[in-house]
């Protein structure tokens, strides 16, 4: 194994994990949801107020234009909320150009994933599932 070139070749994983961070209720976090990719890759929050976007920080970039991603579990609080799908100052791109609507039903979970192939300058959004 030689990690001086930042490459692992022909690796077989027996187990695979991603770090999880429970962000708690969103109302206490301000208007943008803070996503710190140095702490986790999977996040959970309960939207208890309107969210004007995601503030993604510490996007890993080793200069090799590697892809990076994260997932969000949104838990409904029983009240319809507005979600603006901006990441930083740029709107996430969704299939068909249509952003999803957040499920507000009490304790129902929506899962969304985001992928960037340019170090976090632009993001593609994916619906992993809704109304779980």
Which residues does each PLM region occupy?
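Acidic, glycine/polar-enriched metal-coordinating patches/loops
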Residues: 46-132
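Short carbohydrate-recognition loop motifs
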Residues: 39-45
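Intrinsic low-complexity, repeat-rich intrinsically disordered segments enriched
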Residues: 1-38
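Residue-level detector of functional hotspots within protein domains
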Residues: 29, 40, 98-100
């Amino acid at each position: 194994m030689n990690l001086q070139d930042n490459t692992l070749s022909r690796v077989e994983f027996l187990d695979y994990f991603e770090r999880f961070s429970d962000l708690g209720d969103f109302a206490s976090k301000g208007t943008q949801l803070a996503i710190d990719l140095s702490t986790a890759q999977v996040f959970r929050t309960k939207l208890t107020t309107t969210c004007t976007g995601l503030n993604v920080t510490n996007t890993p970039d080793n200069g090799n234009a590697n892809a990076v991603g994260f997932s969000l579990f949104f838990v409904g609080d029983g009240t319809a909320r507005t979600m603006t799908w901006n990441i930083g100052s740029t709107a996430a791109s969704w299939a068909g150009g249509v952003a999803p609507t957040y499920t507000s039903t009490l304790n129902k979970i929506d899962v969304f994933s985001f992928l960037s192939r340019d170090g976090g300058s632009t993001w593609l959004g994916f619906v992993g599932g809704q109304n779980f």
